[in-house]
Amino acid sequence: MKVVVAVDSFKGSMTSMEAGMAVKAGILAAKKDAEVIVKPLADGGEGTTDALIKGLKGERVDVTVTGPYHEPVQAYYGYLRESNTAVMEMATAAGITLSDKKEPMTATTYGVGELILHAIGRGIRNFIIGIGGSATNDGGVGMLKALGYRFLDEKGEDAGEGGQALAKIVSVEISDKKELLSQCNFRIACDVTNPLCGSQGATYIYGPQKGVTPDILPVLDAGMKNYAEVTAKVTDKDNQNAAGAGAAGGLGFAFLNYLDGELTPGIQLILDAVHVEEEMKDADVVVTGEGCLDYQTAMGKAPVGVAKLGKKYGAKTIAFAGSVTKEAVACNEAGIDAFFPIVRGISTLEEAMDPDTAKANMAATAEQVFRLL
């Protein structure tokens, strides 16, 4: 029997690989001759970098960069030597959790560009970048400035930083690093489909949670529109209505227009990066899971992405979770053949989330399930 295990992290309890290895221990206790392949799993959001570093034996690279409000922050990325790939989350450089401030008119993505530039300096040319959790609404201008682009006002001077700069931009000077950047492959984990501007765009949908007040909304959106129009003239591309252009305060748009980036649903991108599909081609059973299995899981979260891949090759898919809601039955229709909560007996949330307890529960549940297979 061949089993492929790809379990998302149980936040505050087990990392993806810890959960996966606990499942493996349980399977082998029941089926000593089973071939069990454990792969890291993430959805492109928080924790993706750590999951891939641990699961693919990558290297963590710490870098001091410019934070969203121009203060130095400690960011990092993962280096996957085998594929010469950097894995990073923009939130480590320009995330909303880095500061108590919420000032989108000045918040910048400059540090994201610095992080990319550091990786390029090491000879890295392939990038997987998660762009969730941003504090910014600058259209990615800060990032592009760090990468050598110049955004100029009507006087031919620097237009400034943050959302306030967008309305001032009248021209763009192409980066002196353009040839170097053209050698890079940017794959962006993006699960939102919002355009750049308008009522469903970056500013109106995500701006309020970043501190954009009602009176500033139309001002910032108009600035974003101006930036898009200037960009279209410079790049001969008009991606302002592309799905995901409005992600991370317009960072998705910057990747599309200036860096030829590819926006891909996070789970699809990660499954490709860890080569799960290759292992599933001859798998008998697939095991996945996450901390809580619910209706949102069925709507396309990581475990369902794994299940769909398993179905493609005729494998049965089992999911384990810390808790399972009534609405989780929707996961059966989404491709998960059967799911099981791992908590054994009455316990407090704190007890259930204890890492040692969670691993023991995971292994024990997996063992009992696989005794039937």
Regions inferred by a protein language model and the residue ranges of each:
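N-terminal loops that bind phosphate or other acidic moieties
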Residues: M1-I131, A135-L373
